[in-house]
């Protein structure tokens, strides 16, 4: 996805620590941590609820670590973890036992429940100690705390900044840094003991048999020292309504329910207009605006309403490129890659295949080749789903600037949209697979930029055709120019991108500057379906490949075919499975006719649901690409983000694909063409078309009932 750390840098202890590797500090692992998110706040802890002073553990607000340690002891010992529960996306509950306390014997009799609730500026941690001992339990409870106000980029790089000095207050502690803010900790009831130097607060309790002791700790980041780049949405932004799914197979309904809970915590907005909501890309590394990620998440979630798409479009349009800047990658009309606070922007050590170099991204960075055409595609799709016409019309000027960038600036290598990092310290690869080795030949050689990615040509074609339709619909000029560009692009693509192996033809992942096809078989080809760039026979060839065992792991699509020399099921982009990548292919297959497309769609849906079950119905950013026949559940990718916006949004994309729902609110129609719904789906309610809730019911005999929607909307089956 974004700014990935290299293979040598990603090695670390499996416990989540950032231990020293062969090149120094390393990126912490995430797979054994419990996360809660209420953007711009997030917490990461062990399964026992403890935040120990190692790795990425802690409480973060605005990409700063407000707490780097939060450890509970009872009578000098840490409680023993029994279990935990994710409560929505922004809260956790941890259950533990106090070994050796209470009655003698092996049975535990003293328990601690720890409830963590995040808010946009911090968290409230509530503790309940229950005693089932026969006699009064006298206990001394302590919470040991630390704060380093480290930037998330430093933590990700494996650095361990020095802690700040604690100051005692009447009811807790505080830590301050004039440049980064004030962290305030308030305890209820007031602690009996505050050890300022050690960062410890403590209480003494006498707990009668069958009774409880309760206390709480509230933590807030105040006075950040610099204006926040993004904040929580306005309180009157209603959030998401969970679609209700009925099916003989329970997995899809459960995935939708928990995915929406994860999405709630990722909502953010700019301080100037907190009603324009977008989704942060993911926690912990990407809790901010990312052009590509935020666009795709909003696009996949259009069946839940167009409001998120509207906020995403406007937020990005306000930051659309206006000048030329090699350092930031900015160009007139270009949509940005990511935004960070100036003192928290990304700095990582990366590898280009031969040499280590510094990856240092500016606070506002435009190094993405695909966000610009995808912005146009999102505007068009949102219009079809019912985005108000006046709001669409207001965004036609930035749409025109996007298309001008596409034709005049982005399209320059043999007539294809391509990229190259001209700063020397930006992303070497600027598609969605942006790790250093993401674009490689079948024999494992790394391709050289400038590169024209296959899926980007599909986005560009779709954007040009969408732009033409939009300007015509609003009685504006320019449609012929965009259609001519699209036709030429399709002709060039057909002539240059297709390669063959023993199984037949498929599109290369990319073209190098001299036109050489980079011949790896990759999941990128799935993004071409439904864009309009391909004809029916070409779409069928791709559908067959997507269903093959080379790409289809049984848990979803591998990013790189298992037959490639560079395949590694636990690499970032060269063999792993990404839920959103698979969901995009599923959406394209739903728009492709023929038995091959249907078979591949059903298999990929089942694979994603199988994977979701293995992750407790909370799909991570990515996971291992091992074959389902070899494992009963997918292996986690150890540095994978969770929750992650487009992974969670994949659940809604699956639902829409199974329904085959394609609205055209401006045209007054909604098309439904369900794809072998049973056992995955029998009914769905709570979807939204044109601002109105709709429900779809499917019967075994093929009858389709569409309930609700705007007046005058005609059903096409």
Name each region found by the language model.
Residues 93, 98, 246-289, 315-365, ...:
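Extended glycan-interaction surfaces of carbohydrate-active proteins
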Residues 3-7, 111, 119-124, 131-289, ...:
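Acidic/polar, glycine-enriched structural segments that form the non-catalytic walls/loops
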Residues 299-303, 376-384, 462-472, 584-591, ...:
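Short glycine/serine- and small hydrophobic-enriched flexible loop segments
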Residues 132, 138, 208, 470, ...:
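Beta-rich accessory regions
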Residues 2-109, 121, 134-136, 148-154, ...:
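An extended acidic
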Residues 229-233, 251-258, 305-319, 388-408, ...:
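Extended, well-ordered alpha-helical scaffold segments
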Residues 293-324, 523-536, 582-601, 605:
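Alpha-helical support elements that line or immediately flank enzyme active sites
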